[in-house]
Regions:
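Minor-groove-contacting beta-hairpin "wing" of winged helix-turn-helix DNA-binding domains
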Residues: 61-70
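A short, conserved structural fragment
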Residues: 52-62
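Short, amphipathic alpha-helical interaction segments positioned at domain boundaries
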Residues: 73-95
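Short helix-capping/hinge SLiMs at alpha-helix to coil transitions
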Residues: 19-25, 54
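Short amphipathic alpha-helical interaction segments
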Residues: 39-50
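Exposed, interaction-prone assembly regions rather than primary DNA-binding/catalytic cores
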Residues: 97-103
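A short acidic, leucine-rich amphipathic alpha-helix
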Residues: 29-36
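Short alpha-helical segments that sit at the start of domains
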Residues: 1-16
Length: 103
């Protein structure tokens, strides 16, 4: 996918969430977004990550993605991301210790 197409789909995605799925009470599933935008789940996650990096308040929970309505929703997603970071770091550290033992 070329850069211009990526930007267009990101803009459309962000606008779609902001207009139709605001707040944690109104999430949309990844499967629904995949069908609407004709992309796979990995591309949905890439789009969400890119938009978050640009400062868009795209949040998520077990029920799906949504455009944040308030700071509490943003804080909940930040906490979720922080927890994932810690778990990934623990997995990395476990692999590093295994690699060090074999050296």
């Amino acid at each position: 996918m070329d850069k211009a197409k990526k930007l267009n789909i990101e803009e459309a995605f962000c606008e779609y969430l902001a207009k139709n799925f605001r707040g944690a009470v109104n999430p949309v599933s990844s499967k629904t977004l995949e069908a609407i935008f004709h992309v796979k789940g990995t591309e949905i996650r890439r789009i969400v990550n890119s938009l978050r990096c640009k400062g868009e308040p795209i949040c998520s929970d077990l029920d799906g993605y949504y455009y944040a309505d308030n700071q509490l929703e943003i804080n909940a997603t930040i906490a979720q991301l922080s927890s994932r970071i810690q778990k990934i770091a623990q997995a990395r550290d476990g692999l590093l210790s295994c690699a060090n033992e074999e050296s």
